[in-house]
A protein has these predicted regions:
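Bacterial N-terminal signal peptides that target proteins for export
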Residues: 2-13
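Ser/Thr-rich, Proline-interspersed low-complexity disordered segments
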Residues: 20, 24-93
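Acidic, Gly/Ser/Thr-rich repeat motifs that build Ca2+-stabilized beta-propeller blades
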Residues: 28, 65-241, 289-292, 297-305, ...
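Beta-strand initiation motifs
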Residues: 91-97, 137-141, 194-205, 265-276, ...
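Surface-exposed loop and turn segments in beta-propeller and other repeat-based domains
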Residues: 141-154, 203-218, 264-280, 327-356
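Beta-propeller blade signature
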Residues: 187-195, 246, 250-262
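Conserved blade-ending motifs and adjacent loop-strand segments that build the rim/top face
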Residues: 399-418
Length: 437
């Protein structure tokens, strides 16, 4: 296979004589599931909201001197079509379906793209391989195979995360998150080989390692944010109830959202990080999947709960660093263990659901594809019940979460491609895409 890199050219045409105006989780037990269309109320308490950005108004451009009407003029480039506005209510799901893309994968747990215009989808197989989907076909040979160094002694271990460097087209770098043969977390950098559909298996450079006290709550997500830094989700270290109180302990990196600069190996700490180390946010139990809205930079974190509540957390793009999402003082928006300090500013989730409805939340992607009715809708699911929710802010800024689809899938992740289309993964081997009927 050959892949051509898309190069975009832009030009600015000036037409004299005209005014230019700038415009601005283990196997589940049976659960009770709500029917599609049932509303799940947002959690109460303090929740960050996105601030509206004012549209700047520019002064009219200088008209210049009159030109000869007979003189040839340059053709005017038509303006780019405006992006659809975000919806403020959830769409009727009856006109849409989850259409199969490929099957035959071995425990797929994540999907992403290289952002290079190729259209290729890269699927993470938990045992330790990365597979390519090209033009709707699963490529037989894996892009990367590190099964010999990936440990999967527990059901939550394995190859868990994949992120391509923003300059992948130039440097060929990508990053993975896996548990090693000892069960510890490894974040490592690899490089593509001369063959674009094959990684260099021997190019591993270890960026970060974390000792894991138990076999679960490993987090796993890695993603480049709009700031160009690598974001890493870490679980609280496992067992039940965070027995080591890692999530609230700023001296350890477990139960956190980390943010590092990987352009200087092994890595450096961005100046804006609030505590002078890798930590950007804390108080998380197992942020298995998180997602930056590619259009706005807003952050959604699906944090897997303990025995009662699954939650979705949110930060606006301009949020102050150092957010505390409350675990293990709270599970969701509800008291769990101990009393937080009087000056603690705990951020409650914008959506939650209880365990009669499911058992393990799977985030999540903000739809930015071709269907206007879905613009700005955050889609998330539950691994155990197969339910799929939509989440939006209404015209008054209130969060609305509602079950939109009931499936028989085991969904470890909801992901999207570089065009903003959204996909479901079924741990039993299938990838599906949201489409019109």
């Amino acid at each position: 296979m050959k892949k051509s890199n898309a190069i975009k050219y832009s030009s600015l045409l000036i037409v004299l004589g005209l005014a230019v105006i700038l415009a601005g989780c283990a196997a589940p037990s049976p659960v009770e599931t709500p029917t599609a269309g049932e509303t799940v109320q947002p959690a109460g308490g303090d929740q960050p909201t996105a601030a509206a950005d004012p549209t700047p108004t520019a002064e009219p451009a200088d008209r210049g001197e009159p030109t000869d009407p007979a003189a040839p003029t340059a053709p005017v480039t038509p303006p780019e079509p405006e992006a659809p506005e975000d919806v403020t209510s959830l769409p009727d799901p009856s006109g849409y379906t989850w259409a199969g893309v490929v099957e035959g994968l071995n425990s797929p747990v994540g999907l992403t793209t290289a952002g290079d215009g190729s259209g290729w989808l890269y699927v993470i197989e938990q045992p330790g391989r990365i597979r390519i989907i090209e033009n709707g076909q699963l490529v037989e040979s894996p892009f990367l195979d590190i099964r010999d160094r990936v440990g999967d002694q527990g059901s939550e271990q394995g190859l868990l995360g994949l992120a391509f460097h923003p300059d992948f087209q130039e440097n060929g770098f990508f990053f993975v998150n896996y548990t090693d043969l000892n069960g510890d977390t490894v974040v490592a950098r690899y490089q593509v080989s001369e063959d674009p559909d094959q990684a260099d298996q021997d190019s591993e450079t270890v960026v970060l390692t974390l000792s894991q006290p138990y076999k679960n709550h490993n987090g796993g997500q890695v993603s480049f944010g709009p700031d160009g830094y690598l974001w890493i989700g870490t679980g609280d270290g496992g067992s039940a109830g965070d027995p080591q109180d890692n999530a609230q302990n700023l001296d350890v990196l477990l139960g956190k959202l980390l943010r590092i600069d990987v352009d200087q190996l092994p890595y450096s700490i961005p100046e804006e990080n609030p505590f002078g180390d890798e930590i950007w946010a804390y108080g998380l139990r197992n942020p298995w999947r998180f997602n930056h809205d590619p259009a706005t930079g807003e952050l959604y974190i699906a944090d897997v709960g303990q025995n009662q509540w699954e939650e979705v957390n949110y930060l606006p793009a301009d949020a102050e660093p150092g957010a505390n999402f409350g675990w293990n003082y709270r599970e969701g928006a509800h008291p769990f263990e101990g009393t937080p300090p009087a000056d603690a500013e705990l951020i409650d989730p914008v959506a939650e659901y209880s365990h009669p409805t499911g058992c393990s939340v799977s985030g999540g992607a903000v739809y930015r594809g071709s269907m206007p009715a879905w613009q700005g809708v955050y889609l998330y699911a539950d691994y155990c019940s197969g339910l799929v929710w939509g989440l939006v802010q209404d015209a008054d800024g209130n969060w609305q979460s509602e079950v939109l689809f009931r499936t028989d899938r085991r969904i470890p992740a909801v992901s999207q491609d570089e065009n903003g289309e959204v996909y479901l993964l079924d741990i039993r081997g299938e990838v599906l895409r949201l489409e019109e009927n």
